[in-house]
Amino acid sequence: MRGTVKWFNAEKGFGFIKYNDLEDIFVHYSAILKDGYKTLKEGDIVDFKLIETSKGLQAQEVTEVQLTTI
């Protein structure tokens, strides 16, 4: 799935992703697949796996999409 980061609080380590008309999807820093400091910025486009937990929708295996222009 592909969505857009609505907001992410680096100090608290979590935020939310917007995907189509679904409710906001929770994302925790531990679900971000990248080396180094795991954070996201508002407006980042990300690919992720969606799971449903007792607390609602949650993103897993989150990766930033690198867009290229020609």
Give the positions of each predicted feature.
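S1/OB-fold single-stranded RNA-binding interface
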Residues: R2-A31, G36, E61
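OB-fold/S1-family single-stranded nucleic acid-binding modules
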Residues: I51-I70
